[in-house]
Amino acid sequence: MSINNKYLEMALSLGADNAVLVTPDDIVFDGRTYLKCMFGCKDWGIGCTCPSKEGFPKPWELEPLLRKYKSVLIVHSHIKKIAQDASFAIEKEAYFDGDIMVFSMSDCAICETCAGQDGKTCRAMMLARPSFHSVGIDVFATVKKLNLPLSPLREPSEEQNWYAAVWLNS
């Protein structure tokens, strides 16, 4: 089994609904996601992994860095915490397998309430990661291209689709 197949299997064994391995060329980057964050997200200026935070790189600064990776494991779950926990576990495993620059990202589900909501610093800075849109990835266009499910929700009761990514050097 190849090392990347190991991570695919790991994602599924950790509860992911889907996991696919792609290249950075399969990821759709679009700096307009920054506008969607700025004018569409209730966490703008508050969330600890928000691109509005001082020092957070802009999407157009991050794209060239992310394109240096050789592959990207996309993890899909209907439960945000499962997607994030799987991406963390795979990031850790890949690191110990020798992929020192491995990097995961997902919408944050670490704390029940983000410390940023209270104007405090992140309680889990070693685990907190940026979301797709905060680094300039059009998650809708990307997952559509990969034939994975995602559509805007009309009602809060509709089933959600959450995505995480693990950027790999293998």
Predicted features, each with a name:
Residues 2-170:
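Auxiliary alpha/beta "docking" domains used to position bulky ligands
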